[in-house]
Every structure is written in C-alpha cells, then in structure tokens.
C-alpha cells in the first residue's frame, strides 16, 4: 500500500468559482484521490480557501462586510458547493487559520536565518485618492506583453506573465479607478530566489516524468529575460499573516503582512495540521505526511493546478521549502491544466463570465458535470464548453451507454426471473471473450488513471461500458430466453455482476451514480477487480436486487436552448 499526498490549488475566497476553476484543479485531484483510495492506498487529500490579500479585501468591501466575516461566510459557501460536487477532501481548510499564521511566520524566520531574505526599500504606487499604498493586485492596467487591458499588478491572467505594478501601461487603482498615483518609498522583504536558482533548476531537471506543460512553464520563468528574480513576500495590507520572524517581531515590518502567494502554498501543510486538530490527532499524525525526518520519506506528493499557478509551485514555493533547510516534503509530480473556455469566450471569475459551480448544481446533479468536465479536461490544450457538446456527451455516454445497460438488464431480469440474480446456465465462449476484453481494457484504464491522463481514462472507462453493451446486443438474452431460458439466466447473471463492476470502476468519475448502482444491487463490496472473471461472480445466484430509477436522464433540446440563453456569459 502506497501513501499518497494530494493537494489541489486552493481557490480564492472572492466569490463562487466557475467550472473552469473546478476542472483545472479540484475535480481532477478528487478523481485521482478517489481512484487511489479505491485501489487500497492511504490517501491524504487537502484543499482550502485562499483568504488573504487584495482579492479578499476588495470582495469584502464590495459586499459591505468586514473582511473576516466575509471570508468566514464564503469559506462555508465554497465548502458546501465542494460537497455538492462530491469533492472528497480529507480536510478543507482556511489559509487564515492560526496554524497557517504560525507556519508562515516560521518559514520566514528560517529563511531569514539562512540568509535568503533581504530587506529592500522600494518605490511603490501610492494612491492619493485612496490615501494608501497599493499592493500589486490593487493596481490594474494594460499588460506590456499581450495588451490585455485588465492585467493585475502581479500577473496577467490572459497570458500568465508575472508582472510588477510598474510594468503596467496606464496603471489605475483597483479600489477607486483613480489614475492619480505616486511612487513613494516603502520597505519590504524579498525572498532571494536567485540565490536558490541552481538548486531549483537541478530539482526541476530531475523531474523527467512531469507533463510538458508544467516543465515548459517552469523553465520559461527560470531562463526567459533576466531569469529567476527575487520576489517580494510582504505587502502594505491590513488583512493577512502579520510579518514576524518566527515567533519574534520583525523590526521595521510593523503593520505589514506576508504576500498571499507566500502564505497560500504553506496552507497545504497547515491544512494537514488543521486536519489533525479537527480529528483529535497529534502533531505526529500530520508530520508523517510532510516531514521526511518523521515518516514522510515514503510519501508520493502530487499537486493539481491550472497553468497560471505553475510558476508559484515550481519556483517560489520550492524556494521557500529549500531555503528553510528543514526536511519538508517537496512535490513529486505536478499535474497542470490549460484553460477551459466558455462558449466562444473565456470563463472569468473577475468578469463574471460563464457557468459557476452553484448554478451548475441548480440545474443538474454533480455527476453530469463531473463526467463532461473530466472527459473534456484541458490537458494538452485549451478546451471549450458548449451546451451542444455537453448535451451530446451526457445523452450518449451517460444515458445511452451506461444508463441504458443498467435499465435494460435490471428490468429484463425483473420481468423474466424476478428481482433476484438467476441461477441457471453457465458461461460460454461469448462470456469468456467478454471477460478477456474487459480485463485488457481495465488494464488500459488503470494505466491512464495511474498516469493522471484524465481524458484518456474517461475514454477507456466509456470503452468498458460499451463492451458490456455490445455483449448484450450480440448475446440478446431477450431472444435467447424464448428457446434457452437457462442460458439467458447465465447471461443476465453476468450482466448484473457487470453493473457492480461498472459501479466500482466508475466511482472516481461519477460517485453518486456508482452508489446508486450498488444500492440497487444491495451490495457493499467495493473491492477493486484485480481479476475480472472473479469480479463477475461477486453477486451469487439468489442475491436480491431492486430495479433502480433512471440512472441518467437525457437533456432535451428545449432545456439546452433555455440554459444557453440563461447562462449567456454574465453572472449578475
């Protein structure tokens, strides 16, 4: 049994996330966590809300609430929606937790002690209209790289280029929109990433199995232009982790907080500590996942994120870990994703464009969305959500292929043999061929899941469903029953067991449907099918079942047209 630590990029607290956010991090991370648990491995799956920095302050101000109250409220909202999508976190934490405060301050102290922090007096934009310094995300302007006119002072969300506020063309305050900005002196802490460049580069070069998307972004930022730069890790804000050197005050840093991108990844560790606290466990129980001197040396650590988060996870966070000179676990594999676009344009939380997670759940259950998003995950290139494609995928894959098999088998058995697994007959050559095909396809599915090739895994799973349908079509038990009822019973006995097999292997993708299938079969045996032949004998003759309701309903043309109009791209 392996030990697998999984973290999803933590979503900003500023509002409900859209489907592009979901498929770029949390959902594929959940798929992998569910699969690994299903294979019997020990899994720790951590996520949290990212609550500090400019986005939280601006969103709270817009909502007319104190930032602490806003964050507490939105954490519960995001937690509830995550549960609605059946995201199986072991803990969904908060970056504003006391654990994260202490750990962030601890890392800063360790970095300073090792000479990787520099105090820098810099010139920063001060808004005369707002009477305050403007940290990077409080400034908007035109990106000098791609021309996007809503680029932020830390990064352009259009081309992903990291920026400094002074790089922006025609900068303006994100608070008031004022362009009356002055450059004034202020002192900040910088993480000396350039001093760690050789270590970081050697570490990245050692990851020969990483996706091209991950390594290409990391190496681009290591080498393009002037290469890896030192990074400011403090801000002139009120809301955040107060700057301290470990447990001690940091002279000259009074009233400042750590930059959100310094403390946010540390929440992966702190969130695991929060899990221990919430479950009455000792520090040793979370440290065995993170400290290589306390049991984490055999842990495989996998991160999931959108491509815009890759630089922080391949450069800045590893620099924090390495520079601490403490035995913390570094990530083993980073699964990154391109963007999911929406109906001819971009999803955007800041612009309110696209289908958002709460809206999605209000019209269809989670499994419909999970299946489409995962089977169309933007792995090798950007992908696009269209209502026509969504309707087609749901109707063909879920309703016609899987749902139809479950319905036909259970209803036919009920009408001919009752709601018990029939006892007659024995498998023939056709059944043996099916078992061989399923065994081969299952191995391909497992290989894709192990490799985190999400779209290919969905394709292999669908092929497994199709194989069962093709068997039923060729075996035709509804015809055979007229001349050889014993053989028809053997076919249906295998087909009922096939439903259980599909429930087990489909659970990572469509957990609610899998649970419904198992409940209708009156079965609680979720063991992974190492041997397909044996797996198709789990339900014995005489075992009772109930004929389920429709597993997946079809989306009508009228519904598709109505939703397309309702979600035309702007969230009010």
Curated annotation (Swiss-Prot):
InterPro entries: Anticodon_Met (IPR041872), Met-tRNA_ligase_1 (IPR023458), Met-tRNA_synth (IPR014758), Methionyl/Leucyl_tRNA_Synth (IPR015413), MetRS_core (IPR033911), MetRS_Zn (IPR029038), Rossmann-like_a/b/a_fold (IPR014729), tRNAsynth_Ia_anticodon-bd (IPR009080). Its main location: cytoplasm. ATP binds at residue 349. Pfam families: Anticodon_3, tRNA-synt_1g. Its cofactor is Zn(2+). A motif ('KMSKS' region) lies at residues 346-350. SUPFAM superfamilies: Anticodon-binding domain of a subclass of class I aminoacyl-tRNA synthetases, Methionyl-tRNA synthetase (MetRS), Zn-domain, Nucleotidylyl transferase. GO terms for cellular component: aminoacyl-tRNA synthetase multienzyme complex; cytosol. Keywords: Aminoacyl-tRNA synthetase, ATP-binding, Cytoplasm, Ligase, Metal-binding, Nucleotide-binding, Protein biosynthesis, Zinc. The keyword Zinc-finger does not apply. Zn(2+) binds at residues 143, 146, 156, 159. One of its GO terms (molecular function) is metal ion binding. Binds 1 zinc ion per subunit. The keyword Iron does not apply. A motif ('HIGH' region) lies at residues 11-21. Its EC number is 6.1.1.10. It comes from the Bacteria. GO terms for biological process: methionyl-tRNA aminoacylation. It catalyses: tRNA(Met) + L-methionine + ATP = L-methionyl-tRNA(Met) + AMP + diphosphate. It is found in: Cytoplasm. Is required not only for elongation of protein synthesis but also for the initiation of all mRNA translation through initiator tRNA(fMet) aminoacylation. Belongs to the class-I aminoacyl-tRNA synthetase family. MetG type 1 subfamily. Monomer. This is Methionine--tRNA ligase. It comes from Cereibacter sphaeroides (strain ATCC 17023 / DSM 158 / JCM 6121 / CCUG 31486 / LMG 2827 / NBRC 12203 / NCIMB 8253 / ATH 2.4.1.). The lineage of its organism: Bacteria, Pseudomonadati, Pseudomonadota, Alphaproteobacteria, Rhodobacterales.
């Amino acid at each position: 049994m392996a030990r697998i630590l999984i973290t999803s990029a933590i979503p900003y607290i500023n509002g409900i996330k859209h489907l592009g956010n979901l498929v770029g991090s949390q959902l594929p991370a959940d798929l992998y966590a569910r699969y690994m648990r299903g294979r019997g491995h020990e899994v720790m799956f951590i996520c949290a809300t990212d609550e500090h920095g400019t986005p939280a302050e601006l969103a709270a101000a817009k909502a007319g609430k104190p930032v602490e109250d806003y964050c507490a409220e939105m954490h519960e909202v995001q937690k509830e929606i995550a549960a609605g999508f059946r995201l199986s976190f072991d803990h969904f934490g908060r970056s504003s937790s006391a654990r994260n405060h202490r750990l962030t301050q601890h890392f800063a102290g360790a970095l300073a002690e090792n000479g990787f922090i520099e105090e820098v007096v810099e010139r920063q934009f001060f808004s005369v209209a707002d009477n305050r310094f403007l940290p990077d995300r409080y400034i908007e302007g035109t990106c000098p790289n791609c021309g996007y006119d809503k680029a932020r002072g830390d990064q352009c969300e259009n081309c992903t280029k990291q920026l400094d506020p002074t790089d922006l063309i025609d900068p303006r305050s994100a608070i008031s929109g004022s362009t009356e900005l002055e450059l004034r002196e202020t002192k900040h802490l910088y993480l000396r990433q350039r001093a760690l460049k050789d270590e970081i580069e050697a570490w990245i070069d050692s990851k020969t199995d990483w996706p091209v998307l991950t390594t290409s972004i990391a190496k681009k930022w290591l080498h393009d232009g002037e290469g890896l730069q030192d990074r400011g890790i403090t801000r002139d804000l009120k809301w955040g982790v107060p700057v301290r050197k470990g447990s001690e005050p940091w002279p000259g840093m009074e009233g400042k907080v750590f930059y959100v991108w310094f403390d946010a990844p540390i929440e992966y560790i702190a969130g695991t500590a929060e899990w221990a606290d919430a479950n009455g466990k000792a520090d040793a129980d979370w440290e065995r996942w993170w400290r290589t001197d306390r049991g984490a040396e055999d842990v495989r650590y996998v991160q999931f994120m959108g491509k815009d988060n890759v630089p922080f996870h391949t450069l800045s966070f590893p620099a924090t870990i390495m520079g601490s000179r403490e035995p913390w676990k570094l990530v083993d594999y980073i699964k990154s994703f391109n963007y999911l676009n929406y109906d001819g344009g971009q999803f955007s939380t800041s612009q309110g464009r696209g289908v958002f997670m709460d809206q999605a759940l209000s019209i269809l259950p989670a499994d419909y969305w999970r299946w489409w998003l995962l089977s169309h995950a933007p792995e090798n290139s950007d992908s696009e959500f269209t209502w026509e494609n969504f309707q087609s995928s749901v109707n063909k894959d879920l309703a016609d292929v899987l749902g139809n098999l479950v319905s036909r088998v259970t209803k036919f058995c009920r009408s001919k043999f009752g709601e018990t697994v029939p006892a007659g007959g024995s498998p023939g050559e056709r059944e043996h061929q099916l078992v061989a095909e399923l065994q081969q396809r299952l191995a391909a599915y497992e290989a894709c899941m192990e490799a985190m090739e999400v779209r290919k895994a969905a394709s292999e799973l669908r092929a497994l469903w199709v194989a069962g349908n093709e068997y039923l079509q060729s075996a035709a038990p509804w015809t055979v029953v007229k001349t050889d009822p014993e053989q028809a019973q053997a076919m249906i006995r295998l087909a009922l067991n096939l439903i259980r097999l599909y429930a087990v292997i489909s659970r990572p993708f469509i957990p609610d449907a899998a649970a419904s299938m198992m409940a209708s079969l009156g079965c609680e045996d979720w063991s992974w099918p190492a041997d397909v032949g044996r797996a198709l004998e789990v339900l014995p003759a005489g075992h009772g079942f109930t004929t389920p309701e429709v597993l997946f309903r079809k989306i009508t043309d009228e519904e598709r047209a109505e939703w397309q109009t309702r979600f035309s791209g702007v969230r009010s």
